[in-house]
């Protein structure tokens, strides 16, 4: 959408109003969902570019495979934020294997004050798989103790999302075909036990005891795991250690270092 600017977080992003670029000065980075536009905007005009793959399951934004293949072949490099995305890129575009550059995103653990008192609250985000979340709640309804509540997080700004994640004890993950979904990671850093789908990309961080994987669509296992965890006493020492490792993995220093590497690659042009 023309002029679109995210309202989910504060930003001062400058928006370019045209598609006029200088091949001597400009370097474009396309998200994978727009990779096929590189042919018209860059290849035909001899402008350097890269592709930022944020999700391995959205690498097919067009049925024009020739255009898409050309866009990946001519890209200077391909940025990837997870092991799963890297595998997907290598499988879809084998000739790009040597061009893949590791990237990352930051989740600031300082946003999560774990000294705040927790409530007997379960949170979830239904946006990706609403039918799944509705079924889980339906089967859970007669087994949830009266002193436990469930909160749907939907269309909230960042501040409100963090507010409820910090209050809850359990977060239900309904991620679906994600490169590496942020909500389960944020929920884990906010002090939640995570139960649910990995979205595939989440497999690299989905380790017990902090995370429990449910196979996509296995509603009954999902419900039973929630019931077990409501009553269960968790190994806090192991969970806290795992949470610290997670915070370290998504620390801002890692993203900065990866950005510096990327900028150096661009400057070599």
Stretches with model-predicted labels:
Residues 1-27, 162, 182, 195, ...:
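N-terminal pre-catalytic "stem/leader" segment of glycosyltransferase-like enzymes
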Residues 3-74:
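Extended catalytic core of nucleotide-activated donor transferases of GT-like folds
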Residues 83-92, 99-161:
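Conserved catalytic-core segment of nucleotide-activated headgroup transferases in glycan assembly
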Residues 169, 191:
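A short alpha->beta transition loop at the rim of the catalytic pocket in nucleotide-sugar-dependent
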Residues 176:
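Aromatic "clamp/platform" in nucleotide-sugar-dependent glycosyltransferases that forms part
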Residues 217-224, 230-268:
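A charged, aromatic-enriched C-terminal amphipathic alpha-helix characteristic of glycosyltransferases
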């Amino acid at each position: 959408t023309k002029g679109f600017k995210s309202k989910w977080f504060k930003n001062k992003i400058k928006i370019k109003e045209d598609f006029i670029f200088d091949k001597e000065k400009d370097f474009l980075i396309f998200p994978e969902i727009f990779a096929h536009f590189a042919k018209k905007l860059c290849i035909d005009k001899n402008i350097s570019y890269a592709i930022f793959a944020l999700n391995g399951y959205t690498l097919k934004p067009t049925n024009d495979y020739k255009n898409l293949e050309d866009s990946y072949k001519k890209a200077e490099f391909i940025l990837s934020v997870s092991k799963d995305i890297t595998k997907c890129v290598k499988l879809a575009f084998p000739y790009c294997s040597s061009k893949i550059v590791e990237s990352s995103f930051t989740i600031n653990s300082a946003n999560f004050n774990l000294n705040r008192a927790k409530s007997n609250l379960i949170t979830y985000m239904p946006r990706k798989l609403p039918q799944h979340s509705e079924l889980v709640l339906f089967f859970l309804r007669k087994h949830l103790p009266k002193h436990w509540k469930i909160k749907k997080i939907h269309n909230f700004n960042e501040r409100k999302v963090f507010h409820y994640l910090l209050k809850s004890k359990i977060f239900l993950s309904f991620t679906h075909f994600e490169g590496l979904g942020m909500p389960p990671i944020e929920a884990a850093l906010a002090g939640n036990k995570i139960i649910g789908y990995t979205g595939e990309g989440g497999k690299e961080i989905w380790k017990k005891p902090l995370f429990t994987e449910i196979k996509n669509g296995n509603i009954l296992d999902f419900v039973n795991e929630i019931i077990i965890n409501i009553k269960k006493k968790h190994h806090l020492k192991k969970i806290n250690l795992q949470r610290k490792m997670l915070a370290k993995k998504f620390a801002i220093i890692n993203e900065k270092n990866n950005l510096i590497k990327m900028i150096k690659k661009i400057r070599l042009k």
